[in-house]
A protein has these predicted regions:
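Glycine-centered, small-residue-biased loops immediately flanking beta-strands
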Residues: 238, 261, 331
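Conserved SAM-binding loop of SAM-dependent methyltransferases across substrates and taxa
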Residues: 247-259
Length: 392
C-alpha cells in the first residue's frame, strides 16, 4: 500500500498525514516537498522517478517497508494521486488530503464551489480553456508553469474575451503568498482566477454555426449535425468514432458536450485530417484523436466505441457492419447519406436491422432578384439511427 499525503506550500501536513510521514520508512515526493519536511532518522527519501512509469520498480525495491508519498494539497484535485491510482489501482493507494490550492484560491477570491469551475492546464494543451469561456463565468486555472498566464491571455484575446480579468494567486498558503493582476510578475507556483468578459463564441448546445469550422465544403451542416448528435447522445466517459469526419464537426461537438467524453475522427484525406486538428484546438477540444486513413481498414485497433457517426464513405464495402459489430452494447450508430447509392444502402440497413430512418430537408431564406427573398432548399440528408441491443 502506498499512502499519499497532501502538503501545503508552507509545509503544513494534516494531523493524520503528519503521523504517517513521521513513521514512514521510505518517503517519496518532489524535491521541493521533501525539503519542507523535517528529517527523520533512518528514513529513506527519494524523489519521484523519471519517467513516472518506473515507479513500480521503486516500490518493488522497497517492498515490505512503509512507504509514504508527498503531493501538493489535495492529491486528487488534478494531482499526482489520480495518476498513482490509475497506475497502481484503487486498492493499492490511500490518500490523506490537505487543503488544495483550488480551495485556497476560492477563499481568496470569495467564490463558492457552485459558482466557479476548475480548468487544469498542467501537462495539457492550453487550448482546452476555450471550451470553458463564456461571459460572466468564474474560472480557476491550474497553471503548468510561468508561461501559462501569457498563453491564457493570448487565447482570451483571440477568442473574443480580451476584457477578462486575470488574477494571479501565487504561493497560496505560504508566507510569500501574492495576489496580482496579469500582466505582471508570475510566481512559479500559482493559480489563475479568471472573471470572463467578452463576446466570443460561448455555446455548449449542439449545432454550432457552420462558419465556426474551417472546411472545404465537406462539413456536416448545422441543422443535420444537431439532429445526429441528439441521437448519438454524448455522456461522460463515452467514446465516439467519427468516420469520414470531413471537418470533424460531429466529433468536436461531441467532445464539447462534456470534458470526460472522448472521440476519434477518422479521415482519409491528409489535408482534411490536419484541418480537423486545427478546428478541435480552436474550439477547445485539443484532446480529439485524429486518425488519417480510409475506413474500414483505419478502424483496426481503435478502442471500442459507445457511439459511431458515419458522415462520409458509408458505401465502402462492409463499413456499416464493421461499425455495428464494434459498438458496445447499448451503443448508438448514426449514418448520413446524400446520394442515391448511400440512401439505398441505409434503407436496406433499416429493413435488415430496424432503428429509425429519417429524411432531413432544410430550407433557408436567400435573396431572390433585387427586392425579394425566397426559400432555397439544401441537399436532403437521409439519416439512419440504430441502437445495439444489450443482449446481442
Amino acid at each position: 500500500m502506498l499512502t499519499v499525503v497532501g502538503i501545503t506550500a508552507d509545509g503544513h501536513l494534516p494531523p493524520a498525514g503528519r503521523a504517517l510521514v513521521g513513521r514512514a520508512e521510505v518517503l517519496l515526493g518532489g524535491e521541493r516537498h521533501l525539503a519542507l519536511v523535517p528529517a527523520v532518522p533512518g528514513q529513506v527519501r527519494r524523489p519521484w522517478p523519471r519517467p513516472m512509469a518506473a515507479l513500480p520498480d521503486v516500490l518493488r525495491e522497497h517492498a515490505g517497508r512503509t512507504i509514504v508519498a508527498l503531493a501538493s494539497g489535495d492529491p486528487l484535485v488534478s494531482g499526482i494521486g489520480t495518476t498513482l491510482i490509475r497506475m497502481l489501482g484503487t486498492d493499492a493507494v490511500a490518500v490523506v488530503p490537505a487543503v488544495s490550492s483550488v480551495a485556497l484560491a476560492r477563499a481568496r477570491m470569495g467564490w463558492s464551489a457552485e459558482e466557479s469551475a476548475v480548468v487544469t492546464l498542467v501537462g495539457r494543451d492550453a487550448d482546452a480553456l476555450r471550451r470553458e469561456l463564456a461571459p460572466g463565468r468564474r474560472l480557476l486555472v491550474l497553471s503548468s508553469d510561468e508561461t501559462t498566464p501569457a498563453a491564457v491571455a493570448a487565447i482570451l484575446d483571440e477568442a473574443g474575451f480580451a476584457g477578462t480579468a486575470i488574477h494571479v494567486l501565487g504561493d497560496l498558503g505560504s508566507d510569500d503568498e501574492t495576489h496580482t493582476r496579469y500582466p505582471g510578475p508570475v510566481p512559479r507556483l500559482h493559480v489563475l482566477a479568471l472573471e470572463v468578459a467578452g463576446t466570443g463564441l460561448a455555446s455548449w448546445a449542439t449545432g454550432l454555426p457552420d462558419d465556426a469550422f474551417e472546411n472545404d465544403g465537406q462539413l456536416t451542416k448545422r441543422d443535420v449535425r444537431a439532429s445526429a448528435l441528439s441521437r448519438l447522445a454524448p455522456v461522460p466517459g463515452a467514446l465516439l468514432w467519427d468516420v469520414g469526419a470531413g471537418a470533424g464537426s460531429v466529433a468536436i461537438e461531441w467532445l464539447r458536450a462534456h470534458p470526460l467524453t472522448s472521440a476519434v475522427a477518422v479521415e482519409a484525406d491528409p489535408e482534411r485530417a490536419a484541418r480537423i486538428g486545427r478546428n478541435a484546438a480552436r474550439l477547445g477540444v485539443p484532446r480529439l484523436d485524429v486518425v488519417t486513413g480510409r475506413a474500414p481498414d483505419a478502424l483496426t485497433g481503435l478502442p471500442r466505441p459507445d457511439a459511431v457517426f458515419v458522415g462520409g464513405g458509408a458505401t465502402a464495402p462492409g463499413l456499416l457492419d464493421r461499425c455495428r459489430d464494434a459498438l458496445a452494447p447499448g451503443g448508438r450508430l448514426v449514418a448520413h447519406g446524400v446520394t442515391l447509392e448511400t440512401e439505398r444502402l441505409l434503407v436496406d440497413a433499416f429493413h435488415a436491422h430496424g432503428g429509425e430512418l429519417t429524411r432531413l430537408a432544410v430550407e433557408h431564406v436567400t435573396p431572390l432578384g433585387g427586392r425579394f427573398t425566397g426559400w432555397t432548399p439544401a441537399r436532403a440528408v437521409v439519416q439512419w439511427a440504430w441502437t445495439k441491443e444489450h443482449l446481442q
